[in-house]
Structures are given as C-alpha cells and as structure tokens.
C-alpha cells in the first residue's frame, strides 16, 4: 500500500516543527514544505531584539540546515501558492506546478493588522513580521533619529527598547490606558511602564493618531491635539491572519483558520497551526495564542492527529519578552488583579504569582527564568500554597 503524502504550507516555527514532529512520530511517507520565503525556516522572536542590536546578526534557523535532506523532507522555497486544491487534493503554484497531497498542514502565519492612515506613508512606515522587515528597520534606526511607535503591546515595547538601545529618541502611542494590556497582569504593566520611562521612552496612553502629513519629517497629530515629528514610524497593533487561501477553499475562517483542539479544520484532511489558526473551544468561544511555544505545541498536536496517535498533553501557556537587560517570562493564566510579588521589582529581580483560592494558576518572572521549571510543574499539578510562604524570600522556592 502506497504511503500518503503530506504537504506543509508555511516557512516559520509551526511549519518547521510540524515537519520535525511528523518524522519524530514515525511518518515515513513523502513530506513536502512550501514557503514563499527564500530562507530556511527561521525563529521570529529575535527579529525585534538581537536582529536589531547585534553587530553581525544572523537568522536563527528552526532546524539545522542539514536536517531537511537527512530526514527526506522536500523544501520548496520562494514559491507562491495559487490554490490549496481542497476538492482535487492538488496544491497549485502560481508557476503552474501542481502537487498531490493526502493531508495538508497550513502554517502561513499572519500579517501586521493594517493601519491605513500610516500605510499611506509607504516606505517611511514600518511593521515587523519577517526578516526583511528587521533588516530595513536596522538601516533606519540610527542614533538621534526620532522614532514613533504605535502600539504598546509586546512587539511595540520590544521595539521601543531596541530603538532606545540604538540611541534613538522614542515615543510610544497607545490607545489603551496601559501597556501590554492583553497579556500582562497589572503589576507587570506598571513595572514595564516605569522601566521604559526611566530609559527615556515617552509613552502616551489613551491616545491615537488623527492626522498624518508626510514631509521632510512625518508630522503626526494626536487625538490630544499634540503634534509629533518623526523620522521613523513603526506600528504594531495586532495581526491579520493570512487566511485568503483558506477562504477561497471554503474552510471556516474568523481572522484565522478555525480549528478544533486537534488542529483539524472543517475538512478532516486539512490541519492548521500557529498565528494563522484560531481554535474553537468546547464552549464555542474562539481563542488564538500568538507565541513561539504555541506554534511548537500545535505542530506536535497536528502531527499526532494526522497520524492517528494520542494527542500530547499541553503545558500551561508560556512566552517570554526581552526588553533592555530584562528577561520576563509569562506562564499560565494572566487574568485577575490580585497578584502577589516575591522580591522587589526595583532591583530588577522579582516573581509575581497569581493564586486563586490558594491554587497557583499563573506567574511572571523578572530575570528569574530558572524558576520557570518548578512553577510550570506547580501550575500543571494544581499545587496549593500559603501566600505568605510563597513571597517570603528567606524560604527557597524549591523547598515549598
């Protein structure tokens, strides 16, 4: 009996890890990966950090260059897909080639959510999703240049830190009343706001751009009435999933390809993962997790589901952010206002804990990354704590 052919569409973390997971889980059939980028699949997190700060930055490949040939995975780089071929099971490229598939994994990521007012600036306005974006930003983030960043989420703050370290004059504009409002708890939001302000970043909350004039410098008029002059304008206000191919194939979409918890779409032969996917939970709600670890997890889940194997157990959600000399790691549930703090954030060493009825459900570490491993185990096991003991620095965490 002829083994099935699996095609992976995408060139990022989820795509590469799906290939690795399929081989690790025993798939020996024909395996192809199609990507519109000419690079081997590379890590995205360094784009806003080391790719802007190091003297001679290099893309960090998800898998070693020799892995692909050694594992008999056929790479098709720099190609554009015309149709997924849901009915014919034939992937069609814009160059006319067609490729048969029995199962398909879509991991084509997302684009920056557009902001037409700034997009009209053309090459003077920047977003950050790919290696080419980072290379262009690196060229323009020069000392003493005025940089305006729209959006104070994770990417916006990481870019603010990198631009400041490149000795730019940075202003951040945020519509909300706080920074990192979607994915950090209140005490961490306050810490980050103060950290950036101390570094010289001007952060304008509860504000937005109303009018833009392109001249020798870009003139930005804000809702508050203030006018800013900028040499460089960057924005990061969320993502827009690259779902067009899926829509054209009549797959369910909702700013993302709708999948179940096995990463399966409405077509049982088609799976999706990473930023392009959005999960319909058991209660009907739609949930997207935009993180490096989620891309890895969904790649492993999809591979297992494709092969009819038991699905791996998911660890608590985890992501990290590097800003200035700080490493922050977020794990578990970030909701809620009653967080405990172990240590003193002013010394740039602390851990915030989220206890619910004594059960640890979430935590954020500040330059204490070594503690993430035990914290992960505690969250997974539903361990209960005495709050006073948890924040007592005289008691080693590992002894609790």
UniProtKB/Swiss-Prot annotation:
The domain of life is: Bacteria
The record's comment on protein family reads: Belongs to the bacterial ring-hydroxylating dioxygenase ferredoxin reductase family.
Q: Which cofactor does it need?
A: FAD
Source organism per UniProt:
Shigella sonnei (strain Ss046)
Annotated pathway: Aromatic compound metabolism; 3-phenylpropanoate degradation
Chain sites annotated for binding FAD: 5-36
Write out the GO cellular component annotations: cytoplasm
What is the protein's name according to its record?
3-phenylpropionate/cinnamic acid dioxygenase ferredoxin--NAD(+) reductase component
